[in-house]
C-alpha cells in the first residue's frame, strides 16, 4: 500500500521528523495504538501514521520507497552518568535463508533496505506510560566508512554460515556490529535453510545495542569515540587480523619485556593488564571499552595465564549472580544468556614455561590473542543446562550445609558439565546476598571451567 503523503526529498522528511522533537509519542497516536497491550511495534506505527501520514506496511523495500529511506524508531535510556544508551538492538529486515546468500553485499536485501536510515530516538522511562515517552532526536544515519567495512565483514560472516549449512548455529556473538537476532513470535519460530536439513531459528539483521548506544551518544551527547583502525586497513583485513598485527611484535616476550618496550611500569595494580594491552594497541592510556571497535561490538577483554600444561590455574570468573533475576527471567532474558549471546571476548593469552614450585618468581610470555564468542550449540545446551538446573534448585530452595568453618551448597559445581558452573566469589564468608527463599548465601558468580578455556585457546601455538 502506498503512503498517503508523497515526500519529494529526504530533507522534507527530516524536517517533519525534527518537528516532533520535544513532543510526546502520544501526541501522534491518531489510532489509539498505544492502548493496545503487547503491541511491541506500536510506537513506530504511531509515528508512521500520525507524524508522516503513512499507511503501516511491512514491505521489503524502504519505507519511503521513492527516496530509498527507511524509518526506524527506537528507544534510549538515560544512565546514572547522565549519558544515553540504547534500550535494545535496532532490528532491520528478516534474513531470507533461501535467497540472501545469492547476492553480493551491494545487491543484498540488507543494503538495499537499510543503507539510508531515518532514526528517531525516544526516551524510555520505567513506570512512565508509553504515550508520555518524549521524542528526543531525529537523525539521518548513513554508515560511516570505517563502520561500513566492519558491517560488510559481519554480513559476510552471516552469509558464510548460511552457505555452510550452519544457519542453526548463528549467534549474535559471531559478529561485530551487524548481528543476526532471533525474530518471531518466540525463539521457537523456525525456518528451513538451503544447505542443511536442520531447521534454523528465524533471524533478522540488526544493529547491536552496543553499536546503537555508541551512535546515540555521538549524535545526542556529541561524544567522540577513538578508533583503532582506519578504512584502508579494514578494506583489506579483518578486525582479528589487524589486532594480531598489533600484538605480533610482542609474541614470545615476557610481560616485563613488553612493558619496557611500550614504556609502562610493571605493577601489581588490577589496571596493569588493561594498561599494558592499550599500550600494545597503540592507544596508551585509553580504556579498551571506550574504543570504537570495542564499545560498538561489545568486546570485553580477558587475560588468560596458562600453566606449562596448557591449562589455566584458575577457572574464569564472570559477574556476580542476581539470584532473584535468575528465578524470574525467561531463558532468553536471563543474565547468563545475555552475557554469552551478545558478547565477544578478546582473549590475551600468556603462558608460563615453569611451574610455581620450580620458580616462585616465574614470569609468563605472551602466547597470542584470539577473538572468541561462545558457540550457539554450547549456549543452547551446556549453558542452558546450567541455567535450568540452577533455576530448579533456587525454586526448591538451596541446600546449605555447614562444613568445618564454612557452608557448602548444592548449586552446580565445577564437575557439572565440564563447561560452566557456579562457585563463590566474595571477600569472605560474611559477604553474602539473600536467596529467593530468604536464606543468605556467600556471593556467587558463574564461571567457565579452566579445562574448557584451555580447549578454546589450544589452537594458539
Give each language-model segment a name.
Residues 1-461:
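Nucleic-acid endonuclease domains
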Amino acid at each position: 500500500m502506498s503512503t498517503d503523503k508523497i515526500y519529494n526529498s529526504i530533507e522534507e522528511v527530516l524536517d517533519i521528523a525534527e518537528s516532533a522533537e520535544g513532543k510526546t509519542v502520544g501526541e501522534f497516536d491518531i489510532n489509539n495504538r498505544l492502548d493496545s497491550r503487547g503491541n511491541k511495534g506500536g510506537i513506530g506505527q504511531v509515528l508512521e501514521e500520525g507524524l508522516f501520514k503513512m499507511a503501516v506496511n511491512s514491505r521489503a523495500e524502504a519505507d519511503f520507497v521513492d527516496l530509498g529511506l527507511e524509518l526506524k524508531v527506537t528507544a534510549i535510556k538515560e544512565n546514572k552518568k547522565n549519558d544515553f544508551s540504547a534500550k535494545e538492538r535496532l532490528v532491520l529486515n528478516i534474513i531470507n535463508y533461501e535467497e540472501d546468500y545469492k547476492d553480493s553485499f551491494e545487491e543484498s536485501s540488507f543494503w538495499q533496505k537499510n543503507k539510508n536510515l531515518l532514526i528517531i530516538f525516544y526516551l524510555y522511562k520505567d513506570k512512565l506510560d508509553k504515550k508520555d515517552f518524549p521524542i528526543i532526536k531525529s537523525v539521518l544515519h548513513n554508515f560511516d566508512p570505517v563502520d561500513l567495512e566492519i558491517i560488510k565483514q559481519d554480513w559476510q560472516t552471516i552469509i558464510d554460515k548460511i552457505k555452510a549449512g550452519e544457519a542453526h548455529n548463528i549467534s549474535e556473538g559471531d559478529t561485530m556490529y551487524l548481528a543476526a537476532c532471533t525474530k518471531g513470535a518466540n525463539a521457537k519460530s523456525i525456518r528451513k535453510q538451503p544447505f542443511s536439513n536442520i531447521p534454523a531459528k528465524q533471524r533478522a539483521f540488526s544493529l547491536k545495542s552496543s553499536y546503537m548506544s555508541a551512535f546515540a551518544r555521538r549524535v545526542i551527547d556529541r561524544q567522540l569515540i577513538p578508533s583503532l583502525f582506519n578504512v584502508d586497513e579494514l578494506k583489506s583485513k579483518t578486525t582479528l587480523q589487524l589486532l594480531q598485527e598489533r600484538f605480533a611484535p610482542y609474541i614470545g616476550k615476557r610481560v616485563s619485556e613488553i612493558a619496557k618496550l611500550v614504556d609502562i611500569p610493571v605493577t601489581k595494580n588490577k589496571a596493569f593488564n588493561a594498561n599494558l594491552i592499550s599500550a600494545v594497541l597503540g592507544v596508551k592510556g585509553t580504556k579498551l571499552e571506550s574504543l570504537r571497535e570495542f564499545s560498538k561490538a561489545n568486546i570485553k577483554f580477558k587475560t588468560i595465564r596458562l600453566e606449562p600444561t596448557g591449562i589455566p590455574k584458575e577457572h574464569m570468573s564472570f559477574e556476580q549472580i542476581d539470584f532473584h533475576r535468575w528465578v524470574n527471567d525467561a531463558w532468553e532474558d536471563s543474565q547468563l544468556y545475555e552475557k554469552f549471546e551478545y558478547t565477544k571476548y578478546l582473549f590475551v593469552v600468556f603462558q608460563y614455561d615453569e611451574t610455581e614450585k620450580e620458580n616462585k618468581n616465574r614470569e609468563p610470555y605472551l602466547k597470542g590473542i584470539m577473538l572468541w564468542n561462545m558457540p550457539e550449540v554450547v549456549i543452547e545446551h551446556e549453558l542452558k543446562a546450567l541455567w535450568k538446573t540452577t533455576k530448579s534448585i533456587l525454586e526448591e530452595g538451596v541446600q546449605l550445609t555447614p562444613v568445618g568453618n564454612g557452608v557448602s551448597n548444592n548449586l552446580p559445581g565445577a564437575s557439572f558439565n565440564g563447561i560452566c558452573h557456579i562457585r563463590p566469589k566474595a571477600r569472605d564468608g560474611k559477604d553474602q546476598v539473600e536467596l529467593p527463599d530468604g536464606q543468605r548465601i556467600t556471593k556467587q558468580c558463574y564461571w567457565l571451567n579452566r579445562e574448557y578455556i584451555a580447549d578454546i585457546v589450544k589452537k594458539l601455538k
